[in-house]
């Protein structure tokens, strides 16, 4: 497949697009505070088998444009979104209204501190794996963003990794709850 290094990739304004087997690697040479890939408006897009890493803000974000035009009917599937760089290290910010759907299906969010993803609006988050999400949220609906959300969250796996300060705690009914725990400093040796 094709690999794009060093700068942000934008799909803004596209319609009726299918993008497959693309690797996007922004890295530290990319613009500070920018996403590795994103959409600010557009419709009817499918992203399949992408690998998007090393973003300096988020790895892949979907938002309104500056004129308030919404992205509509977007699917990201069978993709890897991970290893956000620097202190921000986020998987993605996905924001629409409650009529413009975004589907995230069978993706791997890995090694991002938070926003794996952070969503607002109409969202389906189905059969994804979130691994090693650090000190932030594994999945965040709404958060401090204003606006309504209608979200379907089904059959996802949240796997604690080596930098997480979360642990699985078995409940009385044998269900598993993931709880945040204070981290102690790691000994140097």
Predicted features along the sequence, with ranges:
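Short, solvent-exposed loop/turn segments at conserved positions within beta-propeller repeat blades
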Residues: 30-32
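N-terminus-biased targeting/localization segments
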Residues: 164-168
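Accessory, usually C-terminal, subdomains that scaffold auxiliary metal cofactors
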Residues: 143-144, 149
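Short, T/G/N/S-enriched strand-turn elements that build extracellular solenoid repeat scaffolds
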Residues: 6-13, 62, 119, 142
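C-terminal functional modules
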Residues: 179-189
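Right-handed parallel beta-helix
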Residues: 1-2, 15-26, 41-57, 67-115, ...
